[in-house]
Amino acid sequence: MPFEQTQLFCDEKPTILKKLDTRNEIADTIRSVSTSKISETSFQYVLKDVNICLPKINIPNEILMKHEVEKYRLLFQSKPQTARKSISVKTVSCAEECVLLCKSERAEDETVNMSAKILNFSCSKCQDSTQYSPNDLQKHFEMWHHGELPSFPCEMCSFSASDFQIFKQHRKTHRNTFVKCDICNSERSYTLLDLTKHFTSKHCVNGNFQCEECRFFTQDVGTFVQHIHRHKEVHYKCGKCHHLCFTKGELQKHLRVHSGTLPFTCHYCSYGAIHKDQLIRHVITLHKEHLYAKEKLERDQYDKRVAKTTTTGLKLILKRYKIGPTKTFWKRKTITSGNDESIGKNAQAFNIVSKTQTKSEDQSQEQVNGEKGEKQHCENGDKPVESESEKATVLSTGQYNKADEGASTTSSSVLSAVQGPTVLLVRNNKITIPANYSAKFMGFKMVDGRQHIVIKLLPANKQILPSPVLQSNTEKNSTANLSPQAVANTGFATGLTTKVNDTDFVKAAPPACSSPVLARKVISEKEAAFISEKNNTLQMVDDSKSLSSLPTTSTTSVRVTTKVEARDNVDLWENDSPQSHPDASDTSISSPDKVSLTPKPNAYSSGDMHNYCINYVNSELPAESSNSFEFSNQGSLPFHNYSKVNNKRRRFSRATLCENLQKESPNKTVTQQSTSDSDTASPLLRKESSNSDNLFASINPLNGTLKIKTEIEEPYNLEETQNFNEQSLFTNENQNLLNVTEEPKWNDIPSAGSPMMPRITSVFSLQSEQASEFLTPEVNQLLQDTLKPKSDIKEDSNNIPSKNLPFDCDQTLKKSEEVVIKSSKDFQMQDDIPVPSASVGVNVPANDLNSKCNGQEKQGLSVLQDVRDSEVTTKIPNIITLLKTQSDAIITQQLVKDKLRTTTQNSGPVYVQNPFLTSEQKNPVFVQTPKGFIIPLHVANKPGLHVFSGRPVPLVNTRSVPATLLVNKKPGMLLATNNGKPESVPTVKTENVHSYGTVTKEPCKTPFLKAEHNNSCLTPGLCSSIGNCVNMKTCSENTLPLKGSYIIKTSVNSSVKAVPNILPEQQGPKMNILDTVKQQNENLPKASLYTLMPDGKQAVFFKCVMPNNTKLLKPKLVQSSTYQHIQPKRPAGAPQKILVKIFNPVLSMSAFNNLSASNSASSFQKEIVPSKPTVHGEQKEPETSRNALPVLVHGLMPANETVHSSTTACPGSSEEPVYISERSETRVLRGKANCAVERNFNKRKTCKNKFAKIKTRIDQDSETAFVSRNRSCKRKYIDNYQEPPRKKSTLNRKGKERASAEDVQEAFGFSRPRLPKDSSRTLRLFPFSSKQLVKCPRRNQPVVVLNHPDADTPEVERVMKTIAKFNGHVLKVSLSQTTINALLKPVSNTSETTYNDFSKRQKMLKPVNSVKERFVLKLTLKKTSKNNYQIVKTTSEDVLKSQFNCWFCGRVFDNQDVWAGHGQRHLVEATRDWNMLE
């Protein structure tokens, strides 16, 4: 009996396919179903006398089941497919998803053999019609015929082979077989290859091959050839008509037409059809709604099955709106509480939950721009439990995409709070919330282009146990807005931000319960460790060593947590006190003596994993209330601030967090106990600004970047002042020991977005709001990632503040931004509370903070405290020391111990910052001043005044910290004076120190000169520009300090003593510098640099003069990397001898206030004393080393100047004197040192060739003044060579030049010297206007490479730098008018301007006689090979360009010939194997 195969079609009603219902017309119009290979044992049906219906349109049944109705329409519109891809095995689907694979058995059904390239064979042993591929036939014989060799017969002859490879070789012999065309019936013979070509050319109609004897058609010529040959075989002819069939199945299928039966009937009506495709067409046309209903039914059934398989619990439905780089919108959904889960002791902490308290759930839901909170206090006998707290949890979208309900057995990650049962468990991408808490979805947060989920936990039962006194004080004085600070967990992404509402939270416990509390804290801290993204290892924090044991005299234990944030259109304060104002946001903290709580040891759990620094800023409190300073005793993990800032309101907000402030009643000492935190990086002060003046920085443990978002300038309001009366800061050395268990390895992490790195984002305005709106977070992050240079900076060590650092200053902030700080020497030592060495504390007598600060800005002192390890000696040398580099072995040991911390910054005029500890535990202290001023400061244990200048002074870079430690990249200057005379100026070594540029448009105005006390020399540590600095990557073996001397001179009788600074390990000739410097130009007015204060004490005034047109200031030097490999090695500790000489006229208090730019400039220009260092040896110094440091002083240093440490000097090379002239034109006068000649400082007069000749030429078109120097004479100098008249005339001539150039002071800039041709050239691209956004170009645009030999101007250099930065992204560059003018006109004329020694080894600049060479630069260049470019022909925009699209791959061509040739290659590929019949 014939076997019947059933299948479902559009419903549960089956359709029967009988065995004889077959036909030969096979045309698959959509796709061919892949044949599933099944084993012989799994075949459950006897396939004897079975034929499967192969309709004309072969539609797999799963299409109907998958509801792809629209594809049915394409079935009848698309071209039929070749028969060679048809199959004999049908896939039958049913509603129960069972698939039955059937194979055709009939030998006459040779549909598979239609293929000219796919060969199938039948088994010669089984004698059935089952077709096998060569591999399947081989397996069949091995399985069923005991490993006998199969037989592969040739269909063209009687040849048979047992090996398929031999069979293939035999088939190649038939290629030369001559056959005739059966359609033409001519006598001409063709080979098989020629026959296919003949069919293609003669018998192909619109790409189809139609058989004249039957209805068969195909698009494949090989299949058509085989089909033609089949007609020669035995045929089955219909008796009622003349239809010929090749198989019995086809004949039986054809006989249905004459029988009048309709085997295919419709399930929805009485329609019947002979062929299946007719029925399909009928259903799609008339019964479409039934298909949709069936689709919906199956989808509902699928959803039910999915719901049964998933567990009940937490499930979120999140609606996302458009999310930009700077703004995030969301809808909030209430999250149901899940099951309660307890955390194990070894549970891995996956994220940080920041504690907040809000007054009500609705209030926190309404606070979109600014969240306001009210403090809640709870007391519990044994264990401090958070009665009402909101936990904000940041979850990565990738971690949460599959957030299902329920808990799993394996714990992959844990979101844990600090204390109590408030713990979110994340197991197998499922979030479980404790039963006593309810969760609220706060929305999405975009951080670094990655999306995260913010969840807030609310306690189910709210129990408020307030302390009346404490609550009243904190409500009035300690209310703060939320600062969006969250720990950037390494498990998610860089800088995860958790928007929470932090308010004061005070816990107290009886003394009897102190031990249990400590034990529980240690356990919770171990549970709350970090998961490092790099190694995914659990870093446990052991706090047993960091818990501070306090003396019994402490009566209260208060921990205050305050955060402040400025937000859009939201008042910064919700405070009852009238002192709050929108222009300055500070945290109001009540006096500690007003708080009375039960004393308990202040052991703060580091399980918080957000040990923020203490930034305890006083607000406008009464005078009797104790004021506190900012402390930074603990680091914090990095986070980004993505809060929205109103630019019209206050431009920054201070985020302060005071932890563990313990007040002692006898002497009112506030003690902070810090704990060990393995991954604490640095406290962060949020300063928000929407313009491009802010410096983006964030501490990122993932990629090792230290980004601190600070503000360049803060508006000063003179109406309101803040007085800090009698405030002094003391640090006890016994409390400066921090036990560090582990530190992340920063060496392996790339420094991304470091503030000191040259950031192109300032050029492309990627940091601004308008640019962020156009660029997606992924693109923005990609662009910033391309700017991440690897940091080769070596981490020297951490540092601690010096023992008992008193600071007393009287600061007056005036409208002209002049600050006078009077120094005092009446500091006294005060006893501090001893703390064991395993702990860290800062003892600050609250009644002895003796700092008087006037001004609207709240001035504060922030002390950075950090310790290398617990074995640091207690004796600390005096301050003003710089880092001593250590060996690589010591650095390797310290990688696990050292901790990176930086202090939070205010915008006040005075800061105390402590860089990192040296190997001798020497502690430099830097004081920040307003821009443009140098402040003398008297420091304890140090005679004389110490002058500090600049913006917040950058800290010294260390190797373990690829991210630089610049809090605010404003450079400063550090000088030391004693009784009106400069001291032996300490040394700053600049090897391993990068030279970076700021991102902001506001230029820096003073160089930063850091000094080291031992070596008695001074070197420029950092001189920043506006981001156009070249990153110097110098290794410790191949770095040399700057060559040259700065001469500091303050009065007639003052002298500078340069102490010889020769290290024992330094090789080569020794450098001997004489002791004294004699003064010159006695006819010039000489006066002391100091003026007297009203109390008779001296004060030093320095004012910087800066041209307004700072955007035209060009970099003076770019380091040539081509010379680094030829430099001899020099010990890393080799110091630098540079002296600075500053000349000032008599200035009074009133005269200084009215000091003009010309007066200040002329005072520095009068005297220029050349120094003659004595050098022994004949060692030749490379030319570039002498020019490695062009020191440009405008005031002290122009903002846009770049200073690099030279890497080309020999170890024994001479010291080159560098002369600093303070002039508005910021000229550079540099004497040249010859390595083979002795020169001493005793000679008052020098020769004419000692000085550089300055020739200035003002170009009004380009508004740029190019200042160049004449090359020094190559002949050697003799000691007694003097030329006084020429010396005097040179000075007079310079004075005339200064007078003539003062009128165009603001239009002056600097041109960079010629670089070697083999050196890398980089250019930077500026937008035409401030409103213009420079974006990455689109594709299909040619690359512009302005590598012209004459393209040496700074404008072109910027373009090249941009192209170099965005490797492969910059495809089009448009030039501004200034750039075009610079390109069209020659830079200089050889008859007028001379050139520097920098281009000695190169040819001189050729004068451009033709504009055509410059005009080439304006053309668009297209890269043809690695180093070759061709000019792209430009057409007028009015002419319509014709484009040609490739018919195969869609590639666009503008040239028809290229398009035609491209298409021919596709044709060749398509017809390559037509001569093969395999």
From Swiss-Prot:
One of its GO terms (molecular function) is zinc ion binding. The lineage of its organism: Eukaryota, Metazoa, Chordata, Craniata, Vertebrata. The gene is Znf518a. There is a cross-link at residues 359, 391, 430, 521, 709, 794, 884, 897, 989, 1010, 1043, 1057, 1078, 1116, 1180, 1441 (Glycyl lysine isopeptide (Lys-Gly) (interchain with G-Cter in SUMO2)). Residues 1287-1296 have a biased composition (Basic residues). Keywords: Chromatin regulator, DNA-binding, Isopeptide bond, Metal-binding, Nucleus, Phosphoprotein, Repeat, Transcription, Transcription regulation, Ubl conjugation, Zinc, Zinc-finger. Residues 356-393, 569-603, 658-696, 1282-1305 are annotated as: Disordered. Belongs to the krueppel C2H2-type zinc-finger protein family. Residues 576-593 have a biased composition (Polar residues). It comes from Mus musculus. This is Zinc finger protein 518A. One of its GO terms (biological process) is chromatin organization. It is found in: Nucleus.
